[in-house]
Each structure stands twice: as C-alpha cells, then as structure tokens.
C-alpha cells in the first residue's frame, strides 16, 4: 500500500517513491526454526536515482552479507557519511 501511494505522488519529474528509500526486513528467515542466517530484506524506492531497482541480490554463502553493511550502504545513498555501523566497516558494493 505505502509504495503504491508514494508512487502516485508526483514530485518534480519523479514520484515520491523515486525519491524515497524504504527498507522492510525480518529478524528471522524461518520463524519456526529461529533461523537468522538468511534475513529477508526488501528495499523499495529509488533514493533520488541513487539505487537501481528491479533486482534481487542474493548473499547466501557470502561472507560479506552483514546486515550492518546494508545500513552503511543506505546511509551512504542518503549522504550520511560514516565509516562504521555496528560490526560493518564498509558498505555493500552492489546496493
């Protein structure tokens, strides 16, 4: 609902969704098993043209899949400059 609503609002040459970055995630992949190894994360919006949508990025089996690296990436896209967040010291390059 919220993504459709933001996409319906014009903001200059883009929509409000194009200029927004929303993240939704869960702290469990499979709640019945309490599996927190593969967390489902959805990032919606274009961040003012700073992120490319329409992709699935799968970090299964990759050591660089720290969630805090995603947060660093998102902060970087919003011009919030920091070198660390939680246990992460660099953003995810693919975001």
Regions found by a protein language model. Name each.
Residues 1-95:
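Feature marks hydrolase-like catalytic cores characterized by long aromatic- and Gly/Pro-rich stretches
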């Amino acid at each position: 609902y919220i993504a459709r609503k933001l996409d319906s609002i014009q903001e200059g040459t883009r929509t409000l969704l194009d200029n927004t970055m929303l993240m939704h995630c869960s702290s469990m992949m499979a709640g019945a098993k309490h599996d927190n190894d593969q967390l489902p994360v959805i990032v919606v919006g274009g961040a003012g043209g700073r992120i490319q949508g329409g992709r699935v990025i799968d970090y299964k089996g990759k050591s660089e899949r720290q969630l805090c690296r995603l947060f660093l990436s998102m902060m970087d896209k919003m011009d919030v400059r920091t070198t660390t967040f939680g246990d992460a010291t660099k953003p995810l390059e693919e975001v």
